């Protein structure tokens, strides 16, 4: 069954409209140096004390899921409501994921990732980012390159590098496989590709919280996201992963511009696609 659109998005400054546009859950809108210019590992885990974890990454695929969300947002302090959906479809040694959210005035933004599943997690083959135009990143493992449709120079492909869609399922699968390895204060840094560059995304584990959501009451592990970019305009974002749903996201919250721009996604339903 082909995947329908879904969501992880929300916040890129659009030069033509000046609007905070839906783009990908905890955007790493970094202008940082490309992966070809760094020796950073594609996935790095550090303890709360800053020590690098030595154990190899363990990963467990979440079951196929369709997650529907209610969305409450603000743009320049003006409130709006909409809906969103995340689809995740593993099939044998392959996976497909897609996301989309409708934003008033702006329209829709769709992101998708397709690739294979390895013993340590996801191996993306292509990432597509579609709004007014379609852009992509192609992971060419044989040539050892990641290619960008927007004209950026190719960068080195390193096994374990993710894209802006797959990165969330990579994190979910890592925690699901070995939750004891990720106590409060743990930092997970993953190199993730957009349609123009590769940049590090860092998730910090903040602990378990009880959430009251449209789908009901549930326990979830809170992670906060940060990047090395200064272009996010005071972007603050958080992600809640539910152990009862194999650590899939049940809440996503983003704020920028002192809270004048805001997005809060809360799980409404969880079904099989």
Where in the sequence are the language-model features?
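Bacterial N-terminal signal peptides that target proteins for export
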Residues: 3-22
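Polar/charged alpha-helical tracts
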Residues: 13, 35-37
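N-terminal signal peptide c-region/cleavage motif recognized by signal peptidases
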Residues: 31-33
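Acidic, serine/threonine-rich low-complexity disordered tracts
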Residues: 38-143, 182-273
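Acidic/charged, solvent-exposed loop-and-adjacent secondary-structure segments enriched in E/D, K/R, S/T
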Residues: 143-171
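Anionic-ligand-binding alpha/beta catalytic cores of soluble enzymes and soluble regulatory domains
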Residues: 171-172, 178
């Amino acid at each position: 069954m082909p995947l329908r659109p879904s969501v992880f998005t929300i916040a890129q400054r659009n030069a033509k409209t000046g609007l905070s546009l839906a783009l990908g859950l905890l955007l790493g809108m970094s202008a940082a140096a490309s992966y070809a210019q760094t020796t950073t590992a594609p996935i790095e885990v550090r303890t709360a004390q800053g020590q690098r974890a030595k154990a190899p990454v363990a990963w467990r695929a979440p079951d196929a899921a369709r997650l529907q969300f209610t969305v409450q947002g603000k743009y320049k302090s003006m409130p709006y409501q909409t809906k969103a959906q995340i689809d995740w479809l593993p099939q044998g040694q392959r996976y497909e994921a897609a996301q989309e959210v409708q934003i008033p005035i702006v329209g829709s933004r769709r992101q998708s990732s397709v690739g294979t599943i390895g013993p340590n997690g996801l191996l993306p083959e292509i990432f597509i980012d579609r709004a007014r135009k379609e852009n992509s990143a192609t992971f060419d493992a044989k040539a050892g390159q990641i290619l960008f449709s927007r004209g950026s120079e190719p960068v080195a492909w390193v096994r374990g590098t993710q894209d802006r869609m797959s990165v969330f399922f990579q994190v979910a699968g890592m925690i699901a496989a070995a939750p004891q390895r990720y106590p409060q204060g743990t930092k997970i840094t993953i190199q993730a590709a957009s349609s123009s560059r590769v940049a590090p995304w860092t998730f910090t584990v903040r602990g378990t919280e009880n959430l009251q959501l449209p789908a009901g009451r549930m326990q979830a592990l809170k992670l906060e996201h940060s990047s090395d970019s200064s272009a996010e305009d005071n972007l603050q974002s958080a992600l809640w992963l539910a152990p009862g749903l194999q650590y899939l996201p049940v809440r996503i919250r983003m704020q920028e511009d002192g809270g004048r721009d805001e997005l809060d996604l809360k799980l409404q339903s969880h079904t099989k696609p």
